[in-house]
Amino acid sequence: MRSSDITFVLLSVVATVRSHATFQELWINSVDQVGSCVRLPPTNSPITDLTSTDLRCNVGGTVGVSGVCSVAAGGNVTVEMHQQPGDRSCANEAIGGAHYGPVILYMSKVSNAATDTGSGSWFKVDQEGYDQTLNANCGKRSFTIPSTLAPGDYLLRAEVIALHVAGSVGGAQLYMSCFQLRVTGSGSKNPTGVLFPGAYSATDPGILINIYQTINNYTIPGPTTVFTG
């Protein structure tokens, strides 16, 4: 076995036994929504089956919660991830164990954010590639609700794809949560997007990748278009 292969195996084993994480909090224009509109997954474990409906909003995520968070088009939204439920300490890594990978945010227009199952079309509103931004920012990732987006109910899907054991098919670990939003404003745009499952393939270059080698260019999974209004 080559030394590079041995290094990959050892690092993969170490990373595998380290931390998982959950997107659990939402901020709107710097105001903490205190978990009022998140479909919180039952555990901090990842989804690895890219053909599962759990890919939409995580395990149990087809069932909504009562709260819906209101935000005006053009407003600022921040999602927040941590390793353990209720632990928001910035002293702890948001997602540990060398869980490097992209952060991707999707939205889906729905008739009722509290009851929709997430089976509709999802469009990208923000993405960032292979780095450790979440850990550097206390688990937070911010984006702007597109100013031209039509008003109504939406699901917001926040996702990290951890690539520490993604060198073989089925190794990528996906962590996602859905938030229930009500967008206000006078916009008229209704972007189309992709379905979950279906948006990702197990052999996509951003899904099947050995991160313990030199990476010159990383291809973020999903559609190339990011709707910013």
From Swiss-Prot:
Query: What gene does the UniProt entry assign to this protein?
Result: AA9E
Cystine links in this protein are 57-178
Species, as recorded: Botryotinia fuckeliana (strain B05.10) (Noble rot fungus)
Molecular function (GO) terms listed? metal ion binding; monooxygenase activity
Q: What is this protein called?
A: AA9 family lytic polysaccharide monooxygenase E
Essential cofactor(s): Cu(2+)
Coiled-coil annotated spans? none
- PANTHER family recorded: ENDOGLUCANASE II, PUTATIVE (AFU_ORTHOLOGUE AFUA_1G12560)-RELATED
Question: Reaction catalysed by this chain?
Answer: [(1->4)-beta-D-glucosyl]n+m + reduced acceptor + O2 = 4-dehydro-beta-D-glucosyl-[(1->4)-beta-D-glucosyl]n-1 + [(1->4)-beta-D-glucosyl]m + acceptor + H2O
| Co-factor remark | Binds 1 copper ion per subunit.
Query: Which positions are glycosylated?
Result: 76, 217
Q: Name one GO cellular component term.
A: extracellular region
Q: Where in the cell is it found?
A: Secreted
**Record's signal peptide:** 1-19
Q: Which GO terms describe its biological process?
A: cellulose catabolic process
Query: What's one Pfam family here?
Result: AA9
Provide the function of this protein.
Answer: Lytic polysaccharide monooxygenase (LPMO) that depolymerizes crystalline and amorphous polysaccharides via the oxidation of scissile alpha- or beta-(1-4)-glycosidic bonds, yielding C1 and C4 oxidation products. Catalysis by LPMOs requires the reduction of the active-site copper from Cu(II) to Cu(I) by a reducing agent and H(2)O(2) or O(2) as a cosubstrate.
The record, for Gene3D superfamilies, names: 2.70.50.70
Give the CDD domains listed for this entry. Answer: LPMO_AA9
Give the EC number(s) under which this enzyme is classified.
1.14.99.56
| Signals that turn on the gene | Expression is increased 4-fold in cellulose-inducible conditions (in Avicel- and wheat bran-containing complex medium).
